[in-house]
């Protein structure tokens, strides 16, 4: 087996004051806390040689190679990142239970795997709008999201310079990049939904695949007969892609062209090795609409489309809600697992209550932790700006951190190997009042240190056996240490 050192697996090494060294899963890769001086320089083409060796194959999907029993360099790399055997990664991809998004034209990518038997991953959405954001700002948001731990990033740009924005995001990204191609297709017809057609869509798909997009959200499950099922919903159709296609279906009174031409879409996927993320265009946008007939009818169609994609050796993940109260979350996972035969589930939250605009990174992280525990493979983050506006850098950070917490909580609940190690190290540092180690082991060391130092900024307080909450006389952990010391001196044994 190829050694980790040769593969240069991107771990973040945290060295503690007691000599312990902890290596955490790391998404920055070659960026490692920095970014190129000029985004137009991009980052190194990490996979270039690997891709060239397979360039003459007709299918570039990792599933294609996995089904042939071939362990690709990408599978080996992802396996080392997960501390798992490469053969296990290959077998999970071959049966469709995991995907490894990796377009042949995104050589900068550092491979990772998405599946319920691996670490729960998180996605961050970036992208401009008609109102704001430059290319440079979006590349900066990309680096910022990756810095805080985003495993994949989706470019959802709907404003100016969509093609160029996406190009520089890809050339600067060590993580998989996803898009929703229908957005750019709509821009090509100047926002007139009725003018969309399969030719324009396939042209857009080819353009984005040629650039190197690793996975596409395709809303092929929004069928004409499902649209009336949304009539009595409080919030109707809340997916942008879903609403675009529903409007097209009604305008022409024809079936969704993404559904009727799904085989042509798969040909593009196969050519470039793009993974498909089957979009939930009829997901619930409010608690009242959760788990309704419209949502689950579409899910049945997504199960059908999954089988069609797998026949062509195309990797598939299934997108999910949305807005779901806690008591209905498990049903979503159980049904998706059954209908889509364990294809990875990729959910937006879900948000568990609708009463907290400005805090939906919290309302959704609650649902995300639960649905991750039940088996969801990747969680799409929600920022504090959800339902209110375009997120800025700080919103992106808050969303990513909230979802890193949710994903890790899910890994702990699932008993994922090694998930508890960091918790144990931090708990030990906390009990021993090793403040600097606590900061280093935190998901957000900067914030942890800032909060501690607000009232106790002096260096000597970094070894103090108390914080500003309890002071020197009321700290329970300090008192416990004194109790243990007393018991040891008196040779008092635990009965």
From Swiss-Prot:
Enzyme's top EC category: lyase
Instruction: Provide the binding site for substrate.
Output: 125, 154, 183, 219, 239-241, 280-283, 319, 346
The positions annotated for binding [4Fe-4S] cluster are: 467, 470, 475
Q: What is its EC number?
A: 4.1.99.17
Record's InterPro entries? ThiC (IPR037509), ThiC/Bza_core_dom (IPR038521), ThiC/BzaA/B (IPR002817)
An example GO BP is: thiamine diphosphate biosynthetic process
Recorded GO molecular functions are: 4 iron, 4 sulfur cluster binding; carbon-carbon lyase activity; zinc ion binding
Which controlled-vocabulary keywords does the entry list?
4Fe-4S, Iron, Iron-sulfur, Lyase, Metal-binding, S-adenosyl-L-methionine, Thiamine biosynthesis, Zinc
- Summarize where Zn(2+) binds, as residue positions: 323, 387
> Record's superkingdom?
Bacteria
| Pathway the protein contributes to | Cofactor biosynthesis; thiamine diphosphate biosynthesis
Look up keyword Cell membrane and say if it applies. Answer: no
Kindly state one GO CC term assigned in the UniProt record. cytosol
Q: Which coenzymes or cofactors are required?
A: [4Fe-4S] cluster
How the cofactor is bound: the record states: Binds 1 [4Fe-4S] cluster per subunit. The cluster is coordinated with 3 cysteines and an exchangeable S-adenosyl-L-methionine.
Reaction(s) this enzyme catalyzes, per UniProt = 5-amino-1-(5-phospho-beta-D-ribosyl)imidazole + S-adenosyl-L-methionine = 4-amino-2-methyl-5-(phosphooxymethyl)pyrimidine + CO + 5'-deoxyadenosine + formate + L-methionine + 3 H(+)
Write down the HAMAP family for this protein, in alphabetical order: ThiC
- Which family does the UniProt entry place this protein in? Belongs to the ThiC family.
Function field: Catalyzes the synthesis of the hydroxymethylpyrimidine phosphate (HMP-P) moiety of thiamine from aminoimidazole ribotide (AIR) in a radical S-adenosyl-L-methionine (SAM)-dependent reaction.
Q: What is this protein called?
A: Phosphomethylpyrimidine synthase
> What organism is listed for this UniProt entry?
Leptospira interrogans serogroup Icterohaemorrhagiae serovar copenhageni (strain Fiocruz L1-130)
